[in-house]
Amino acid sequence: MLVMIPKDKEYRLIKIYMYICDMYEQSLKYHCQRYSNNSKPLFSDEEILTIYFFVGHEQKYTLIKDIHNFAKEYLRDWFPNLVSYQTFNYRLNRMAGAVRELSSQLLRMFRPSDCQDDTVIVDSMPIITCCGRNRTGKVARDIADKGYCSTKNLYYHGLKLHMVGYRRKGHLPHPCQIALSPASENDLKVFQSECM
């Protein structure tokens, strides 16, 4: 039995695919360039990014396994050369630079007109992967470590999310840059190295 998605979602899928193809040709290909004999695979990087953003946005899925399963079940007609979950996950993780570049371009492109260029707001918040008696976490071991959040008076194991945003009167700030760091790193050092 053929499983399909509604027409309005099909149009959004096409729009996302065309947008990602344009952005890939302009700049994203330089952030995930392939230097191998397999530089033109049957299942392209543009298709991986399209599935990731479309399913994440339309279906609100956050787990890569769920995104791949949805694509396998409902988007097979659109992506007949869909790779296995392991290959999809591996290739998506290798495109972190392209996702970072695409995010920064989208933040610049959709910047509201009422943003004040002369005033930016800088803030950070903890992303707690474990706290309490557990001294070490099992999530994101390569970047997570132990830190202290003075506003919550809390020792925790995890990461810090840093944001620089343009001030907007009467509205939440519009982010212009977002960065992750280990929990133990000083905010000032992160902003000097990552956000300036």
Predicted regions located by residue number:
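Short alpha-helical elements
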Residues: 1-196
